[in-house]
Amino acid sequence: MERLRLYDEALRLRRGGLGYKRISKVLRVKYDTSLNPGAICNWVKGRHHPLRRCNGIIEGPELAYVIGGWLGDGTLARERNSHKYYVKLSVKDYDFAEEWGRCLAKVSGRLEPYVPRWEDALERWVVKGSNMLLYSLLRRARENPQILLPYLERYPAEACRGFFDAEGSVWRERYQVRVHNTDPRLIELCKQLLEKIGVYCSIHKRRQSKLLKCPKTGKRYHRNSEVILDLAIYGRENILRFAEKVGFTIARKQSELTQLIRRYERKLNLIFP
């Protein structure tokens, strides 16, 4: 885990404009460890990665999708007795849980996919897998989601698909695709990734009720935040590009997106019959 921390810090310092030798000196002073400037260069250039020597995480589009989905609907759990470190997803849609479980298995080097299980208490499909390295990475990302950028920016479409499967929706009446979250850091990260594939959006704030009522028990809970952020994608070209590059794994959301595109086509036919 220490090497991952060095990797994150090295990339952060490089983005701040420091040279490789200077980064090596800073890391030596801060972490009391010696790291060759050449190794730092290989990290920055993407030639090497500290996780590639471990079988715990396999980088690729599946990892980007897993992280994107987890940022929206995921949790972490640890079983101290068995030393299991679980990455979990709890969702309403089976097709989302199924795809996330397949990708999590691929990330972990597992041949068989993780299978979603229905939990009556949650009224959700739950899928989980034990992966200590991914658990550690996501735990640190709670404090600073930007440390995930090196894993996501090579596969921005898959990362966004995971996040939109978790938090996204289609608003046909307003001709928009939207994603909602209370954490401005996650919304900004999503915006960065969308722009990498040429999809542009705007961010709006709105207030929500302080209390949340559980539909099953009727109990009321205090929300963590009274402000929710909406990232909105609109405009025909943006919507079409989103549909082509990103889309949804969830069938009901993909159907809504298809209907929105058809509305655009009908509107265009009325203007140019």
Language-model regions, residue ranges each:
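Internal intein/HINT superfamily modules and their associated LAGLIDADG
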Residues: 1-273
